[in-house]
């Protein structure tokens, strides 16, 4: 069909923009007063909360890093390094992000926290620097 055929169609009564409702002047002031009704009186005094250190409970999980945690830590950190995240160790010619991540793990400089979930739904948080990397993994990472 040609464009000329559509020019004959009448406007179906739709407006481009809906008409704005007229607002009475007195109603506008009432709305502002209603918004401030809950703010009457003096402010409620909040107790000064002192930030306390989380209580160190005896941990239930192992202090050894699992191979799955190690893989995830190294992979995540290597991805960050490849996206130009700041490197936490001195570089000595390394360019591979995974090698740099391994060096950071070896020197315990990776700023991650591992959350281990327990069967009862609770969890424990361990810093990467708190966990022990097993000897067989140290050989792969290049440790002592």
UniProtKB/Swiss-Prot annotation:
Pfam families xref list: RNA_pol_Rpb6
Keyword Cytoplasm (UniProt): no
Sorted UniProt keywords: DNA-directed RNA polymerase, Nucleus, Transcription
Biased segments, Basic and acidic residues type: 46-56
Entry's Gene Ontology cellular component terms: RNA polymerase II, core complex; RNA polymerase IV complex; RNA polymerase V complex
Cellular localisation: Nucleus
Alphabetical list of PANTHER family matching this protein: DNA-DIRECTED RNA POLYMERASE SUBUNIT K, DNA-DIRECTED RNA POLYMERASES II, IV AND V SUBUNIT 6A
NCBIfam families per the UniProt record, alphabetical: PRK01099.1-3 (NF002208)
Family, similarity comment: Belongs to the archaeal Rpo6/eukaryotic RPB6 RNA polymerase subunit family.
Protein's UniProt name: DNA-directed RNA polymerases II, IV and V subunit 6A
Organism, as annotated: Arabidopsis thaliana (Mouse-ear cress)
Upper taxonomic lineage: Eukaryota, Viridiplantae, Streptophyta, Embryophyta, Tracheophyta
